[in-house]
């Protein structure tokens, strides 16, 4: 007859009880890995890792029931390997190792509990005491770094190990701030570096102040910088006038004043009929190539930087003519530096009364009519923007003998017809050549074709001929008509439209407000 079963020794029973308790309170390594991988996977897909999703995904991947997964998850939460987060009324779980570490000044995280063995728990004492005074402050963090991690939730350990090396080096060079938390010595150097760096930029910014120059003298434009628009009052003030105290300044008055100065010899006429300062009074020059590039780079009412001092050089003759004609026609006289006196003023070489000058509109050249540089009438200024630019693009001037078949007078906006001379031709133009009507309303289809050919659009001009567009039709064309009504590609059509509208706008604006285009 068998006796009662033998009881295990008391020591063995105690050890078994301790092991059972430890195994019940610690999560299984497999479950810990599965749960943490599931949380990371859900978060990488921007899915909220709540309890239901975690249990379902662990079951699908590895097979355990949701109850077991829930129990293992609770153990991981107790071990601080997983964090429970409540956000907007819903509870989700995060991998503690992937959560942002706490701020450096905050209290260090508690080291993970190690349930398996009592002897492995007391690592804070073996931490070697460093020589600096700041050792007590970092003792808990160093202890956390040296503590052996548990099988699963060892994540706080690496954070402490990352923080400890960052905080350890600073106390060696500076002993006084070592008593502060580790963040103190670490954050101190950047402000010091920042304090050393700011003085450098002010030294770099010191050179610009001596650069400003008086705008009326046109020094900035001569030096190659952007030209500042000049008002009529500045022009009159430079010439020694009253600055328009007697009434409103108009371009006609300023033009008359400039012509009087030219008659006195204070201003001189260039080869192309423009007014300029005597050569001895002009500021420094820019090279001819630079002036040509500057004149070409800006079009349509912008301030120009161009030079006329090199007009006597034969090799640059054609280039100078193009630049001067285009500048004289496109840019209002008030948009150029007054000191340089590069206002393309109407007139001829020699004294002439202001009333006679008002009547003259012809853009003829200096070789035959001495009037190439003549721009618009005093009250209208830049009325020949579009046509003169068109002539320039063809590489010649309106009445220069180099191109005998080029149509000379350039069309003007409606309502501003040129006053003919005694022989029926515009002033200054040589007779003997059939002239295109100066009023676009009177243009024929061939005049329109010729007009766009001179403007640099010979291929597109045929489209206007095919559609039989005369002057009246051209003036009535809208934007959509130019862009879609003709067999012209969009790019050239846009250029043609902008070219065309530029002239109309300037004509209307100057009729309403003579000073409307001043800078």
Curated annotation (Swiss-Prot):
Signal peptide: none annotated. The modification Phosphoserine is found at residues 150, 242. Induction: Expression is inhibited by miRNA MIR378C. Expression is induced by PDGF. GO terms for molecular function: chromatin binding; DNA binding; low-density lipoprotein particle binding. Residues 1-30, 87-232, 261-381, 417-439 are annotated as: Disordered. Residues 443-511 form the SAM domain. Residues 1-11, 108-133, 167-217 have a biased composition (Pro residues). Gene3D superfamilies: Transcription Factor, Ets-1. Residues 12-29, 134-147, 157-166, 218-230 have a biased composition (Low complexity). Residues 261-271 have a biased composition (Basic and acidic residues). It is found in: Nucleus; Chromosome; Secreted. It holds the Pfam family SAM_1. The modification Phosphothreonine is found at residue 107. Keywords: Chromatin regulator, Chromosome, Nucleus, Phosphoprotein, Secreted. PROSITE patterns: SAM_DOMAIN, SAMD1_WH. SMART domains: SAM. Residues 308-325 have a biased composition (Acidic residues). GO terms for biological process: chromatin organization; foam cell differentiation; lipoprotein lipid oxidation; negative regulation of transcription by RNA polymerase II; negative regulation of transcription initiation-coupled chromatin remodeling; protein homooligomerization. GO terms for cellular component: chromosome; extracellular space; nucleus. Residues 23-99 form the SAMD1-like winged helix (WH) domain. Winged-helix (WH) domain directly recognizes and binds unmethylated CpG-containing DNA via simultaneous interactions with both the major and the minor groove of DNA. Unmethylated CpG islands (CGIs)-binding protein which localizes to H3K4me3-decorated CGIs, where it acts as a transcriptional repressor. Tethers L3MBTL3 to chromatin and interacts with the KDM1A histone demethylase complex to modulate H3K4me2 and H3K4me3 levels at CGIs. Plays a role in atherogenesis by binding with LDL on cell surface and promoting LDL oxidation which leads to the formation of foam cell. Homopolymerize into a closed pentameric ring. Interacts (via SAM domain) with L3MBTL3 (via SAM domain); the interaction mediates L3MBTL3 binding to chromatin. Interacts (via WH domain) with KDM1A; the interaction modulates KDM1A function. This is Sterile alpha motif domain-containing protein 1. It comes from Mus musculus (Mouse).
